């Protein structure tokens, strides 16, 4: 399955909530869902029909996939891995998604969106423990150091992000020094620290059918 290349604002409208896929734009009055709080393809707001149980489970899975930019087969593999591990499956699933390298780069404030973070990783701008890593799905672990390559720090967009990061609150499970483009994974995130609008138990129910 190919990665979605269309207008990402349509995805937020489809899910009926902000997925923060557009970086800075999501925090302004230009955000599409603030102007058109109804699904794409409709000519104005209408009452949403009541979804079936399966429909709600499917929508929740799609929402999580879109937030993290993960393809269907990848997402299914994450679920299988979470299901094998000890602990609550849904929370473990979110933890696996949160510890993807592209997400960590985004959470540290080195990119304005997960899509931009994924691009930075793919283009070789990110290093983990002193080695360049260009795989967005790379799983980081507590103690890992994540930095922007020294040669990449003078890129105009990287400098712009440095200014945008002023006042940005880094999650407590991470550390980030925006002045020096360095960060560290302190520990794994707790569920209450993962601020995504996802009801993970519905995803577990979907894959358990």
UniProtKB/Swiss-Prot annotation:
Specify the protein name.
Small ribosomal subunit protein uS4
- Sequence similarity: Belongs to the universal ribosomal protein uS4 family.
Q: A Gene Ontology molecular-function term?
A: rRNA binding
- Name any GO cellular component annotation: small ribosomal subunit
Which keywords has UniProt assigned to this entry?
A: Ribonucleoprotein, Ribosomal protein, RNA-binding, rRNA-binding
Q: Name one GO biological process term.
A: ribosomal small subunit biogenesis
The record's note on quaternary structure and interaction partners says: Part of the 30S ribosomal subunit. Contacts protein S5. The interaction surface between S4 and S5 is involved in control of translational fidelity.
Record's function text: One of the primary rRNA binding proteins, it binds directly to 16S rRNA where it nucleates assembly of the body of the 30S subunit. With S5 and S12 plays an important role in translational accuracy.
Which NCBIfam families does the entry mention? PRK05327.1, rpsD_bact
Q: Which SMART domains match?
A: Ribosomal_S4, S4
What region holds the S4 RNA-binding domain?
Answer: 99-164
Origin superkingdom: Bacteria
**Matching PROSITE patterns, A to Z?**
RIBOSOMAL_S4, S4
- One Pfam family matching this protein: Ribosomal_S4
């Amino acid at each position: 399955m190919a990665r979605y290349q269309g207008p990402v604002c349509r995805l937020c409208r489809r899910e009926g909530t902000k997925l923060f896929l557009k970086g800075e734009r999501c925090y302004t009055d230009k955000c599409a869902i603030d102007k058109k709080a109804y699904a794409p393809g409709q000519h104005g707001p209408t009452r949403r029909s009541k979804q079936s149980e399966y429909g709600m489970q499917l929508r929740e899975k799609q929402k999580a996939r879109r937030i993290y930019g993960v393809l269907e087969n990848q997402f299914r593999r994450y679920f299988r891995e979470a299901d094998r591990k000890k602990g609550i499956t849904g929370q473990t699933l979110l933890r696996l998604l949160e510890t993807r390298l592209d997400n960590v780069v985004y959470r540290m404030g080195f990119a304005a969106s997960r899509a931009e973070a994924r691009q930075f990783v793919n283009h070789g701008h990110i290093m983990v423990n002193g080695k360049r890593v260009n795989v967005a799905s790379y799983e980081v672990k507590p103690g890992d150091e994540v930095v922007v390559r020294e040669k990449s720090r003078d890129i105009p967009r990287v400098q712009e992000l440095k200014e945008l990061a002023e006042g940005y609150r880094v999650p407590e499970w991470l550390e980030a020094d925006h002045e020096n483009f360095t960060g560290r994974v302190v520990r794994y995130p707790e569920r209450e620290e993962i601020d995504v609008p996802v009801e993970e138990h519905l995803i577990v129910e979907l894959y358990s059918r």
